[in-house]
């Protein structure tokens, strides 16, 4: 089932799953965003996987006369030091670490215990910003409709950090858009400030989520070079 969902509306119809790839998912997602009639939109894709999705969203929302810009908003997961695959928080450029306090309490950790990990992730975040944008700053977001895009929403930790960072820049409207989302994460991020989006748009929210990659036939890993190429394609789009 397809779900195009926001705090204000819900819609359901048929969609074929899994998606062929991130580009197809982005086209589906862009079609669900069009009815929002966003004012001066800009698409911020979370690299790496969100970039091919975001490219198709920007193309769908823009026109030859009024293209919609695509930029990256770089984020990094903050992992549990003994088991880095377990995310205990995240950080986005322009923002502060956003930690899962409940999980930290269960693990017996404090923010101080993560200081070295956070420092390492800040370093990697800065490296990726330089790789993707060089010395160009993130465009001004104040009084614009900002669409934050990723290829899926599992726990929501990275998206929460991204939304908080964007909210600090006072956009007129903040939209989170993903092709597939876990229901629990979707509802956690749909409540507006400080952690949620003004609108949340998803293509499908399966009752049994499994993992983001399960919903794609082609879910290949992307490189920094892939991201740079996709951003160049967005700039070259008519």
Feature names for model-found ranges:
Residues 1-238:
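PRPP-associated nucleotide enzymes
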């Amino acid at each position: 089932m397809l779900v195009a969902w926001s705090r204000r509306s819900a819609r359901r119809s048929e969609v074929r799953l899994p998606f062929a790839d991130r580009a197809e998912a982005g086209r589906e997602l862009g079609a669900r965003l069009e009815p929002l009639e966003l004012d001066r939109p800009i698409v911020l894709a979370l690299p790496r996987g969100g970039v091919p999705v975001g490219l198709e969203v920007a193309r769908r929302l823009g026109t030859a006369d009024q293209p919609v810009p695509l930029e990256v908003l770089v984020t990094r997961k903050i992992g549990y030091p003994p088991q880095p695959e377990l995310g205990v928080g995240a950080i986005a450029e322009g923002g502060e670490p956003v930690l899962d306090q409940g999980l930290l309490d269960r693990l017996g950790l404090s923010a101080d215990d993560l200081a070295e990990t956070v420092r390492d992730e800040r370093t990697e975040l800065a490296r990726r910003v330089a790789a993707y944008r060089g010395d160009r700053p993130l465009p001004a977001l104040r009084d614009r409709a900002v669409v934050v895009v990723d290829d899926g929403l599992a726990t929501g930790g990275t998206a929460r950090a991204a939304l908080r960072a964007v909210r600090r820049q006072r956009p007129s409207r903040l939209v989170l858009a993903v092709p597939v989302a876990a229901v629990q994460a979707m509802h956690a991020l749909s409540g507006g400030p400080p952690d949620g989006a003004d609108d949340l748009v998803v293509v499908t929210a399966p009752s049994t989520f499994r993992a983001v990659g399960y919903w794609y036939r082609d879910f290949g890993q992307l490189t920094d070079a892939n991201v740079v190429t996709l951003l160049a394609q967005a700039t070259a789009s008519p």
